């Protein structure tokens, strides 16, 4: 299965899904440098807190390709940190990478950086998978009856916002994969229309869904036909 970010085999480079082209075009961008990684975060080619953190971790690994001294490492971390100052996962990932790399001699840092970035990515996948397992039980416990499970979601909290599986959408995928009859109401999420990314994801997975205007969400909830509402952009 495709992830949102992955290292290029046999090369010191990383491929990402260019999310600015979705849902109309599927494209992959190759990152060769820390500047490429910073631009990908800044331009929202990658988005979602978990994915931003993983991209930053790989950005530090890319930064050490030619020089792995302290100045290069710290300058790269500052560049990446400035791309999204409020992104918690970004700063967490950079701090973890620096904690792992700074005690090492420069000669050992490149391989260690790629290894740690891969570990952070794999940990995110596992965490999201477990969110799906746990969240599915909550969805089933709160369903209104034996009919179709009706879910409403806002913004995008699926695998495009992480490395795989997603956060709030992970239980939806877990339900569908378990053969549960499920339908998702996707709010468009103005002004950036992240709901279209959610709809694209769901279509790739085969999950039945309907995109609705943000203003229609309240009506659907008021009618009492929604089992659960997941995902938030602003609270």
Where do the language-model regions lie?
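Positively charged, low-complexity intrinsically disordered leader regions
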Residues: 1-35, 39
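Short, glycine-/Ser/Thr-/acidic-enriched flexible segments
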Residues: 21-22, 36, 158, 191, ...
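N-terminal active-site beta-alpha-beta segment that forms phosphate/nucleotide-binding
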Residues: 45-212
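Conserved acidic residues
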Residues: 149, 227-228
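Feature captures the catalytic cores and cofactor-binding loops of soluble hydro-lyases/lyases
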Residues: 219
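Active-site charged/polar residues at nucleotide-handling catalytic sites that mediate phosphoryl
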Residues: 224
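Conserved small/polar residues in nucleotide/adenosyl-binding loops
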Residues: 233-235
């Amino acid at each position: 299965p495709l992830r949102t970010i992955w290292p290029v085999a046999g090369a010191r480079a990383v491929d990402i899904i260019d999310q600015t082209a979705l849902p109309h075009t599927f494209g992959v961008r190759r990152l060769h440098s820390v500047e490429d990684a910073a631009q990908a975060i800044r331009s929202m080619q990658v988005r979602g807190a978990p994915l931003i953190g993983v991209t930053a971790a790989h950005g530090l690994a890319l930064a050490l390709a030619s020089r792995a001294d302290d100045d290069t490492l710290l300058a790269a971390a500052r560049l990446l940190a400035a791309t999204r100052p409020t992104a918690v996962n970004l700063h967490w990932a950079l701090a973890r990478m620096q904690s792992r790399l700074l005690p090492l001699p420069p000669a050992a840092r490149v391989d260690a950086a790629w290894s740690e970035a891969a570990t952070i990515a794999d940990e995110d996948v596992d965490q999201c998978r477990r969110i799906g397992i746990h969240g599915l039980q909550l969805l089933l416990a709160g369903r209104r009856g034996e009919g179709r499970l009706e879910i409403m979601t806002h913004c995008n909290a699926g695998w495009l916002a992480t490395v795989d599986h997603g956060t709030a959408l992970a239980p939806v995928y877990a339900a569908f994969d378990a053969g549960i009859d499920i339908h998702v109401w996707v709010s468009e999420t103005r002004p950036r229309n992240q709901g279209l990314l959610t709809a694209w994801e769901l279509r790739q997975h085969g999950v039945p869904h309907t995109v609705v205007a943000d203003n229609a969400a309240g009506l659907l909830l008021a009618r009492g036909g929604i089992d659960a509402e997941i995902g938030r952009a602003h609270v």
